[in-house]
From Swiss-Prot:
This is Nitrogenase iron-iron protein delta chain. GO terms for biological process: nitrogen fixation. It comes from the Bacteria. Hexamer of two alpha, two beta, and two delta chains. Its cofactor is iron-sulfur cluster. The key enzymatic reactions in nitrogen fixation are catalyzed by the nitrogenase complex, which has 2 components: the iron protein (component 2) and a component 1 which is either a molybdenum-iron protein, a vanadium-iron, or an iron-iron protein.
Amino acid sequence: MDDLMKDRIDLLIDYIMKHCLWQFHSRSWDRKRQNEGILTKTTQLLCDEPVDLGTPADKCYWVDAVCLADAYKSRYPWLKTMDKDDIKALMGALHERLDHLTITGSLNLELTDQHY
């Protein structure tokens, strides 16, 4: 991964960390499912692709994805210069980084507490 990609991921992660409460679910499986749902739909929106709204969960993730995609488009004009494959690669790397920060690399023991 080149430095430009890392810098862009850092900007996108920083926005999520400062503005998106959905990253703070109390269990790891909730966080994993939510990260997947929201970031997949955000990617589809950024790439002007159809978004599946077939379930209540899909609709919930879509609402957060619309807010995130709108914020990204308004704050990071370089997204408009990227082609769909590059956006998908960027968002895939962002997803991996977010999962690490909020799930696998988190020191929050409540994430894995079976009684919580």
